[in-house]
Each structure stands twice: as C-alpha cells, then as structure tokens.
Amino acid sequence: MITTYLIGIIISFGIISTLCSKFNYRSELSSQADYMYKTAMSIASEYGNAYSGGDVDDAPSLPFLKAVSRYTGCNIMLLATDGAVLMDTSDSGLDSVKGFDPAKYKKSNYIVNDFFGLYDSDYLTVYYPITYLYNTRGYVILSKSVKDVRSDADNSFNFNYIT
C-alpha cells in the first residue's frame, strides 16, 4: 500500500515537473521575444531617420548597437530589403542572408528556427522594419540562441524549486 502511494507520488512529481518546465520555457521564450521585439522597435525608430539604406559603418549608432548587443546577449543585424547585410554586431563577415523574405513570417513577431539557414541550430529571431518616409528601407534583426533561452528558463525553474 505504501509502495503504491510512493510510486504515485514519484510519477505525479515527474509529470508536474515536466509540464511546469515546458510551461516555464514557453513563458520565458515569449517574454524574451517581447523584450527583443521592443528593443528592435526602439532601434528602428531611434535610428531609422539616420538610416538611408546604404552603408551604415559610419553611422553613429554602430557603437551603441554593439553595446546593446552585448547587454541583451543578442546578435543585432541591419538588413536591406533584399537580405544584404548592412551591419552585423557579431562581425561575421556575412554579405547577405540568402532567401530572406520577411513576409514568410507574418503570423508572429518572432520565429524559432535557423533563420534562412544562417545558424547551425535554432535561434529565437525577431525582426522589425526600418521605415523612412513611409518606405521600408531595411530590417533590424535580433537573434538569440534557443540554448540561452532554455538556460534562462531552467535557471528560473530551478530557483522556483529551491524556494
């Protein structure tokens, strides 16, 4: 009888832990996506007027964007509408994102995948258009490894277990 109760408790604990971990991960993913989206929106609105669709290496925003990238733990890229990389805070040397089509992901403000083959693993990616005189001139792209998001969710979940 006691063995049955112990087995039931262990199974219940396992099920609850698994479900809570998944819910916590989804919540963390959504929370970080919202934060990244707001950051991308801020970058696009703050520096959109200075952005002319050309070379942004001389733009005063480059050092600031690198600082934001380090602070948020996200890679920040400015892409032209055709996918040409205008600026990349990771200094990857990438010229363009092949097959870039922002219309492909209109259902959500974030995506979790390899972002048009750019990454070797899944990344949480948020993009926001840079507009100037009512025309889309490019896109602000923020990307963060899903492994980092999972780590943040696990740290939060572990903290909840301790308390």
Report the location of each language-model feature:
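Acidic surface patches and DE-rich sequence motifs
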Residues: 80, 117-118, 132
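Extracytoplasmic/periplasmic sensor domains and loops in membrane signaling proteins
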Residues: 59-62, 84-121
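Glycine-rich acetyl-CoA-binding "A-motif" of GNAT/NAT acetyltransferases
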Residues: 136
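Short coil/loop residues immediately preceding or within conserved phosphate-binding loops
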Residues: 73, 120-125
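Juxtamembrane segments flanking the first transmembrane helix
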Residues: 1-84, 90-93, 151
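Helix-start (N-cap) segments at beta->loop->alpha junctions
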Residues: 123, 131-133, 141-161
